Amino acid sequence: MAKWLRDYLNLGSRRPPPQPPTPDYTESDILRAYREQKDLDFEDPYEDSNGRAEPEVTGSGDPKYNSPRHRLIKVEAADMARAKALLGSPGEEPEAETEYSDPFDAQPQPPAPNSGYMEPYDARSVSSEQPSRAVQLYDTPYEEQATKPEDGGSSGQSRRPLEDERPADEYDQPWEWKKDHISRAFAVQFDGPDWERTPCSTKEPWRPQPAERVDTALALEKQPWFHGPLSRAEAENLLSLCKEGSYLVRLSETRAQDCILSLRSNQGSMHLKFARTRENQVVLGQHSGPFPSIPELVLHYSARPLPVQGAEHLALLYPVTSSQSSQGPCTLAAKPERGQGDP
């Protein structure tokens, strides 16, 4: 019973729960040594050990002539030598690099013996003072000597080989081949009966042949390339085997008073409608100029590209006559001209 009361009613003594360890905020030995060394490195010479400023020394002189106090800064020897080289006058000789920071302790460096080596800046200044020579891109092993011998005599034959005077086809001949041999050989060749002077064969650029002349005096119904009422499919059938630039004029299927220009391009057949302005002028598209009649428009664009999108590079070159529609496919495709093949 006593054990039950002690365990369940907490009437007996109870142990406290475990507590986390108490943090130690004391400074370690390594950190303390580092801090002391840091204070020594950046010690102010005008302060005492307690960090208080030293009292000013009062003298009998005028205080306005007292020099201000300066802090001492540790300077490396290499930095001091570099600063002296930058701040020194141009005519001053550079001093030798030493381990001391005091410039008064450095001794001037004796001039080094001439070993043939020169700094790039000095070499550039020396080369600018000397007369400029042509830049030599490569070494010539047979370079002639520019200096003459002291005795005044001839400097001897040049080591550079003489240019080979033989033609390209006679490299197998001996070295003693001379000009007279070449002259005689070419004279016999040129004076022969079979020699003919042929002009230089230059390839002239091919120019397209001009289109067939369109007679503007004839009416539209009497033009050979006017087919009258013709369906779209029949026009495409006629132009399917024709060359690029072939054309015909036909009447529309839906509206008999409208004329259509059927044209063969590199992408197939194109059908363009002729329109009339208020002044009864004929135009072909928005960018076409007005013309009095369709034959005059066809004559104009037989020598100029059409102002129609998709046919800017085309002209009305090859008319498809009405007689060809009764004979069958376009006979112009049977004999393609040079530079133009079947589309």
Curated annotation (Swiss-Prot):
Comp. bias intervals (Basic and acidic residues): 29-40, 73-82, 160-176
Domain of life from the UniProt record: Eukaryota
Function: May function as an adapter protein.
Tissues where the protein occurs: Specifically expressed in brain.
Positions with biased composition (Acidic residues): 92-102
Protein's UniProt name: SH2 domain-containing adapter protein D
PROSITE patterns in alphabetical order: SH2 (PS50001)
Keywords: Phosphoprotein, SH2 domain
Phosphoprotein in keyword set: yes
Domain SH2: 225-320
Organism: Mus musculus
Region of interest (Disordered), ranges: 1-176, 322-343
InterPro entries reported in the protein's UniProt record: SH2, SH2_dom_sf, SH2_domain_adapters, SHD_SH2
